[in-house]
Amino acid sequence: MKIISKPQLLKDVEYKPSKSLQVGKEWSWLNPKHAKFDSTTVEGTSVDNPANYYESSLSDWHTFESLKADIECDVVVIGGGLLGSSTALHLAEQGVETILLEKNRVGSAASGRNGGQLTPGLARWEAQEMADRLSYEDAKKLWHFTSTEAMQLIDDISEKYQLNFDRKYGHITAAVHEGHLVGLTQGADARKYLGEDHTRIVGKHELMDYIKSDYYTGGLIDELGGQIHPLALNRGLIYGFCQNGGTVYEQTEVISIEEKADGIYVQTANAVVKAKKSVVLAVHHASFKLLSEQNNTTIPFYTYVATTAPLELDTKELLPFGHPVYDTQFQIDYYRPVFNNRLLFGGQGTGTCWGPEKTLNYLEHRIHTVFPQIKNLEMDFVWSGTTDLTVNGAVDSRKFGHKFPIYAVHGWSGHGVAQTVRIGKAIANDFVGQSNDFEMLSKIDHQNIIFGRTLAPVVIPLAKSMYGIGAMINPGKMVSF
């Protein structure tokens, strides 16, 4: 059994280079006044690739060696984000010999670069969408799977392994138009209809008890949702996996998978892993590299998050209860208070990747729009991320293969921190024949998107323009992205 330490949260941050390699168009920016690191350098890192806020607010952690020799096991999990780590953990807990392969570092992609908000639902499918599309029993089962069960599972893992994820409870959806309160009310009613009642609608004045901003017309207070340190969660899942005898290889990119008569052969740069029973593709927007082009159901897009320097005013003067918030704009703002009087703030979704300067200007403008009382605003961290979306808004969950099952999940639309963990457990349970939860997810139909990746830089701006025109014509209609 590999002995590794639990992830440890710091009281604030340590400015340092990232231990993850810079991949593709993703980037991290650090305020230049902090970009003076100790003379002690970390192999494979650079001051041009600083750690983002999440990595900086955790103590240095274990790194795993890359795979150098052929090996075999029962199940290979490809991807060390939340989905892959949860799947691996729950397989190992049930005695399944599992190896996890990560092309970079654990939590280096979307799982360690998101907004850290815990909200119910399956990507852009919320309770009303489920109630409209499915039978009552199926909708109820799916809603609880993606809400109460997903949130409880995170708490159960935290308690079982004695892990601190900086978990906090309560969430707010803030309406930017009075008409959006109708949609929020219908959503809350659908949740009650499906047997879950943790929400209440508030008007403009009561909402100001929670958000000290005149920008909103009301909102939905959700006591089920909340916030978390996503990289601490990701590392905690890996800690549990290793405690149960699991094996992790980092900097081990999978080039191809091939099913043969005696197993599935997973080809990496330096070695082959033979999965005797199953393979799990937990690589989200990169799934296309290992799936056929004919089965492309997602379009990738880029997201952006920043963390301020410690503010001059107390964050409780902005968010008295400390609840995370996202709003009902088409291009949502999302934000929450974090350690040392900082505000973490994210927004936008683009088909081409913005650079640091454009992102910095945009997010500073959005913060001043929502909270004009903030003076002398300064950013310490800004970074980009990559995710993907499906046409119908739900996550694409697949199980295929001939003799040996291959699982794949992608299309998160920028939502789903808690749900990735729950779906990881569903994959493990499906593999051992313990439940049909994954079968429920795989029954959701998805539309193929021909040349989706190639057309993303054109399709996403076009869609945003069309929805923008629609919002001007009918500002009370709520469509968020």
Where are the regions a protein language model picked out?
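Rossmann-like flavin
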Residues: 3-10, 16, 132-240
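Active-site substrate-recognition segment that forms the wall
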Residues: 118, 162-166, 254-256, 272-313, ...
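Helical element adjacent to the flavin cofactor pocket in flavoenzyme catalytic cores
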Residues: 189-190, 215-277
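Glycine-rich active-site loop/strand segments that organize a redox cofactor
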Residues: 113-145
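Extreme N-terminal leader/targeting segments of oxidoreductases
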Residues: 1-75
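Glycine-rich FAD pyrophosphate-binding loop
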Residues: 93-113
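N-terminal Rossmann-like FAD-binding beta1-loop-alpha1 element of flavoenzymes
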Residues: 73-100
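C-terminal catalytic lobe of FAD-dependent flavoproteins
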Residues: 3-6, 354-355, 360-472
